[in-house]
Amino acid sequence: MKANRNQKINRICRKLYSKYRKNVISLVTAVVLLVTSMPLADISGFVSKMVSTVTNAITAMAADTYTDITNDIKSGVFTIQNADDFKKLLNADPAVYQNITVLFSNNQSQFKASDFTGIEKGLGNEEYPFMGTVKANEGSAINLPINFALFEYLSDSANLDTIIFARPEEKNSALLAENVIHGDVASANKWKIKADPVDDSGATNYKSFTSVIGNMKNGATVDLDITLSNDVKVEVSGGDNAGLACGSMDENTSLAVSLSSSSLDVSGKSNAGVFVGKMSADATLSIDKCDALTSVNISANNAGGLVGSAENAEINVGEGVTLTMTGSVTGSVTAGGLFGSYTYSKANEKTFDISKFSGMEMALACSSGDTADSAAVGSVFGVLTNSADSVKISITGTANDTITSNFNGTVRAGFYGGIVGRYSANALSSELALSDVTVDVTGSCNSTDFGGLIGKIGDNSKAYVSVKNTTISIKNSTSSQNNYGGLVGYADQAFIDVGGKVTVTANDVSANQSVGGIVGKFNKNGVVRLGGETNLSGFYPKDPNKNGCQIVGNRGNALIYSLSGWSFTRTSSKVIDDMDWGGVLRLNNSDLLESADSVLSFDGSGHTVTINGFSNNNITISNRADFARAALIMQHDSNDFVKYSGASKADMLAANISLSADVDISDTGLTGFMRDNGEDTFTGTLNGNSHKLTMTVGTENDKIVFHTHNGLFAKTSGAKISNLKLVSSFNIVGDNASGGDACYIGSVSAYNSGALTIDSVTADATASPSGAYTNFVGGLVGYVADATSEVSFTNSAVTANLTYDNSTTKVDCTCLGGVIGMVGAVTSKPTTGIKFDNVTVGGNITDKHTGPKSGSANARVGGLIAEIGSDISSSPNIVKIQSVSVNTLNVKTSTKISGSTSGGFIGHNWYNVEVTLDKIIVSNSTITSVSYTHLTLPTIA
């Protein structure tokens, strides 16, 4: 005990002398000046002698505190035969034994834990780390039942025989060494460490320690062979950074590990992993051997199956080694099957081959607490950060190796991902490439955002992510509070590039906000670029809606397009949209090209798309590439991902457009010029110059179900459309939820508010909505709102083939009008109102709904305007019919409830309207109705 106390005094003296040496010199000088009249020239020599005297006194006192073992070292060997010998060495000066050989004789097996009571620190110190040899007599082993690390400071140049530790009490200390520093060694010496769970009484018991090595200092190189008893669970805990092999690895350290064990608990405050708690820049962990770990539990702020957190670190797995591990990883900030958190900032490419980790089947979860809502959980990385510029990180596997994402989400976390919980990048020019990855998601998670590959691409992070040859199967109940994506749950701003064969399977998935087979939600800008074969036949939301979609649930301002040859297999289990607005722009190898002189071009290094813009908003469209260019600019602001020069989006929404040739945009994925969600309004002009424009919206390739504004122009105000031949087909379900947005369909304009001029337009319009909720369908305009300004139709002809194809609905929710579906109430009395002059209407208008078994049901149809609505307190609408020809128009309705009514050649119910009727000619037209009342002319009130 005295030696140990003296040892502490010695260390304190040394530290005080080192720290306050300059103060001693200053003090002595000041005293001399105050109490003597000594000449300045003599003061320097006197002070030097005084300081030397103080120094010698401190040195002598320090030397006296060590146990002298000089005479015990024989030919460089210190022999330990009993506990007293060992304690004598522990209390000796590290400078004396730094390079000696410590020989444990066979008598050391008699050590007991009680022999070392009160000893807290092992051999070596920062100034004199142990660099010698520790060995046992031949045929014997080194058994140490100690509660402290054998070495306080150990050099990686030291040679150690196999050491068997038995930790009798729970202590926040390492097993072998608190610190390992780099010595003069070319390659790592192998250190064999075993854990013996036998205490003084012979009971099977093992107490916790923080790690085998606490901290590896800069440049240290270690090769550890660790054997833990198979029948006892070892607990690694108590440190800020906890890992069985090492708590923390400083920069440029290297650790090789061979592990024989089956059961392990690792818990740390900040970082915890089976092998290492924290790895600093350029640290390397090599796993040369690892038995199957069948009962492992890891917990910390940043918890990882292998490493808690790492920066620019390298993990190598030996040839023929595949890691197999079951148990749990629970993090309050991050939880990852391999890494809780990983940051990469180097200039060269980084590759993670995850095929070696296919046996990692840890149950991943977030612990409860204040950080849960922002916590990230992933089967490989909880959080992955690319903080470099223009650097590629690759995550690759093989088709035969499956990564299992076993989520145990009893506590709601921020983000869950099949590979990465949350990813962020410093630059769009960098890349995260995932290829040849097979992911099985099992268990359940309760997350804000969930993705089959990435839960969330971080806020304000501009990231490029490529996905190739990947299969994702989400098998059990995985719910998302907000957004759910087959590849990415939530992308603040991201470019998702999909190629090769990509298959996503997830049945009846749900989220409060958005569901998509590729991306759940884009918050701001982004791009989805589709190539190869995309199979989403097994992916569908439980309750399809306008944001529960096949490809992207909420696309925000994202551009979505496909390359030539892209094949897409959709689900047949549900009728759902591809995305919440628009469709996939389908490029080809003929006229819609990914090239600078066609529609758009892709910068493969900067990861941006440039649309071939227009110099101003007086534009001529001569082919469908021109149409696509104009449409893309109307739909997208120029941003970091999608760029163009010249006319802006605002300019294009007020453009003067002319056709110089016939244009067919069918099968391009374009649904018109604009976003079909009613977000923007066209106020410009379109002169067709007697050319034909053909469009088909809602094909087998591009399903349209919940899109609200469907037409050449989604929304107009003050627009002028003239000299155009328009052939349009709208295969739209129009099944918006009850109480939600209505569906508007019109070949020219889905929804108009304000003035509108349609002159010399010939339209052949086909539409067949079948949804059970509100649809306003018109041959030219779906809905006219507040017609206080003039809405005129002149010198035009419409062939309207409109069918409400729902015989089971019990509500009369759909208006079918040959020219206008419905006119809303006005806010003030119009001067002119709605005018028809020299307009011809023909075609087939069919309402198949029969209504409820009792009550009333009306067929809201009409050859001109199906219905004019009214607010009781509003001013009347004005309709002027100067010259209208109803020619070869067949109206057929199916309502048959007592009291039901059916519209006819002109309309159904026109409320609060002043009608000026000059000339109507009806010829070759029929009305077929099973309702009790049908109206050749509308009911005008």
At which residue positions do the language-model features occur?
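Gram-positive cell-envelope targeting signals
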Residues: 1-46
